[in-house]
Amino acid sequence: MAPPAPGPASGGSGEVDELFDVKNAFYIGSYQQCINEAQRVKLSSPERDVERDVFLYRAYLAQRKFGVVLDEIKPSSAPELQAVRMFADYLAHESRRDSIVAELDREMSRSVDVTNTTFLLMAASIYLHDQNPDAALRALHQGDSLECTAMTVQILLKLDRLDLARKELKRMQDLDEDATLTQLATAWVSLATGGEKLQDAYYIFQEMADKCSPTLLLLNGQAACHMAQGRWEAAEGLLQEALDKDSGYPETLVNLIVLSQHLGKPPEVTNRYLSQLKDAHRSHPFIKEYQAKENDFDRLVLQYAPSA
């Protein structure tokens, strides 16, 4: 049975979240829609204006438009926006990443404003990019928002800690079972669980794609469900649709590399996707791991090469 479709969330007071459409678009990966909604929505308080701008600039980051964020967020901007700018600075300037992480380490060692959820999320995002999931989890653990918990679920699944991810998901379900983030986290955990749960995950991704839009995130989620069930041809159709939307999206390219191998495609097809991934995302974990394996192989070849 399909999950309930995302709908306007209301708090305990019964008030509809003014930013529901902005947040929902961001969470499902519809970044341009998020930007459009953020520029259109009229809000009731300066605090909501800041929250809207956080999602607006995070959507620009997701589109790799780092300059927009760096140019528009000023030193006088709210602390939440400064946190987004810090992540933009990290993503835009590879040569400055070590110093940005060192400064972040110093901030985290002091008293952190745990009510600034955006800072915790941006700190965790930087640590995750820096291949330090433990530090990312420590940052997220200080927050109690649904988004902090959803990101915790993602990281735990990357670490193959399905047991802990399930506990975090239970917390999300107790807090708001129908929230978009909770539904997505349910799909991620179901995908990692496998077996009969794969169909549950597929239904969640499909329902969101039908009700909202088939974003790259949702298409790759559906494709991953098919791949886990050995339905390679069905997965290929979804991945081609994703590729048509954005030929440089890393998850699509990684999934196509895996799929091409399983379908026995010619080596040049796989190599083409690999080259696209290297061109657009040379620091992607998949590329780093692939290059490490290549180097290991080259060392083995030299080790067993006949001596002159």
From Swiss-Prot:
It comes from the Eukaryota. Keywords: Cytoplasm, Cytoplasmic vesicle, ER-Golgi transport, Golgi apparatus, Membrane, Phosphoprotein, Protein transport, Transport, Ubl conjugation. Phosphorylated by PKA. Polyubiquitinated by RCHY1 in the presence of androgen, leading to proteasomal degradation. GO terms for biological process: endoplasmic reticulum to Golgi vesicle-mediated transport; intra-Golgi vesicle-mediated transport; protein localization to axon; protein transport; retrograde vesicle-mediated transport, Golgi to endoplasmic reticulum. It is found in: Cytoplasm; Golgi apparatus membrane; Cytoplasmic vesicle, COPI-coated vesicle membrane. It is a peripheral membrane protein. GO terms for molecular function: structural molecule activity. Its main location: cytoplasm. One of its GO terms (cellular component) is endoplasmic reticulum membrane. The modification Phosphoserine is found at residues 13, 45, 99. The coatomer is a cytosolic protein complex that binds to dilysine motifs and reversibly associates with Golgi non-clathrin-coated vesicles, which further mediate biosynthetic protein transport from the ER, via the Golgi up to the trans Golgi network. The coatomer complex is required for budding from Golgi membranes, and is essential for the retrograde Golgi-to-ER transport of dilysine-tagged proteins. Belongs to the COPE family. Oligomeric complex that consists of at least the alpha, beta, beta', gamma, delta, epsilon and zeta subunits. This is Coatomer subunit epsilon. It comes from Homo sapiens (Human).
